[in-house]
Amino acid sequence: MGTSFVGYLTFVLLLLALTKVRGGPAYNSPLSSDLSDLKGLLERLEDRLPVEEVETPVQDIFAPNYDSADSSNSAPSLTVEAARPGADMMYNRGSWTQQEKSSPLRNKLRELLNAPRSMRRSSDCFGSRIDRIGAQSGMGCGRRF
């Protein structure tokens, strides 16, 4: 009787584990559907925007900023094109194609859509309440150096 009870309990636990695993794939989550809706909206917005020929220079946010006063430690300046030689090429459906020139507004919309969640939220650190407490005490994450 003890062996059959343990076997029955093991079988029930196995069934529970399998139902949790088959609960649903990640691509069917509500966040994924919201993301696909945003991508569709972005594509419709891109179709309505006029094509602009003026291109703004791309600034690398990870490149160090060198002070002109500190000339002893300054490195030779490199352009963005020299730092990333393949920046104008893009992998697209199995072949390398030249990336089309797009407007600055279109680039900003793409950056917003592709930005990680931590970059999109308005809070600087942990949340608005903790940021307010930190701002009052002068020790919070909202301070920028």
UniProtKB/Swiss-Prot annotation:
This is Natriuretic peptides A. Cleaved upon secretion to produce the functional hormone. PANTHER family: ATRIAL NATRIURETIC FACTOR PRECURSOR, NATRIURETIC PEPTIDES A. Residues 1-23 form the signal peptide. One of its GO terms (cellular component) is cytoplasm. The keyword Cell division does not apply. It comes from Aquarana catesbeiana (American bullfrog). One of its GO terms (biological process) is cGMP biosynthetic process. GO terms for molecular function: hormone activity; hormone receptor binding. Belongs to the natriuretic peptide family. It comes from the Eukaryota.
